[in-house]
Amino acid sequence: MEMDSHNAKPLRILLSNDDGVHAQGIHALADELRSIAEVTIVAPDRNRSGASNSLTLEQPLRVTEIAPKTFSVQGTPTDCVHFALNELMKDDLPDLVLSGINHGANLGDDVLYSGTVAAAMEGHFLGVQAIAFSLVGKQHFESAAKIARQLVEQHLIRPIPTNRLLNVNVPDLPFEELGEIEVTRLGARHHAENMIKQRDPRGHDIYWLGPPGKEQDAGIGTDFYAIEHGFVSITPLQVDLTAHESLRAMDSWLKEEN
């Protein structure tokens, strides 16, 4: 394991995800990073895709160490990182929180629903540099893992120049076929398609969420555009959802006489 030259201590990385502790993506990421870092996995006990930033509030979290430095949590991705940073690793916080590798894209509006992004966001909330990784497919996890290692190694030489959360999407291609890493903004989708109504065996109506909406804003500079053209997309995200440009207009609107 290589050492962090700044403090002569091993680089320490916390991994989480929303696909579950047994998912292929998180283990591909761990395998790639273990030669340069001390890796701890804290991830949900099952698939929690779409959990966003939800926390478990009405019941306790049950945590099981299923392998050395690998913990399964009966909770959401945000629960996992919250537990790891506020309990498991509280006396010696990790240097990085990495989430993923997600089994599918997190582009545009996807980030609002993504448990993968939420896990990284919780790390950011709690003061640790965090990056979310997603593979736009389910085959070439080793490509995304190599991109992750590349970014981590670059961070060790020149720290990431922002305290923003980073969202990385990697095309589902062999590593040697990937384009360059492009800094992008989030694109946008049309709203999701209609719900799918079915009947269960007992005659009750059941509903499935429809497919995600098609791309609405996928122009040059967006994450959608980068992926479509074979580039790796990296998007800095901020947690502040305030629409600052609307503050003055809203203030004037409220003060207008009817």
Swiss-Prot record:
Keywords: Cytoplasm, Hydrolase, Metal-binding, Nucleotide-binding. It is found in: Cytoplasm. A divalent metal cation binds at D18, D19, S49, N102. Binds 1 divalent metal cation per subunit. The keyword Repeat does not apply. InterPro entries: SurE, SurE-like_Pase/nucleotidase, SurE-like_sf. One of its GO terms (cellular component) is cytoplasm. One of its GO terms (molecular function) is metal ion binding. It comes from the Bacteria. Its cofactor is a divalent metal cation. Nucleotidase that shows phosphatase activity on nucleoside 5'-monophosphates. Belongs to the SurE nucleotidase family. HAMAP family: SurE (MF_00060). This is 5'-nucleotidase SurE. It comes from Vibrio campbellii (strain ATCC BAA-1116). The lineage of its organism: Bacteria, Pseudomonadati, Pseudomonadota, Gammaproteobacteria, Vibrionales.
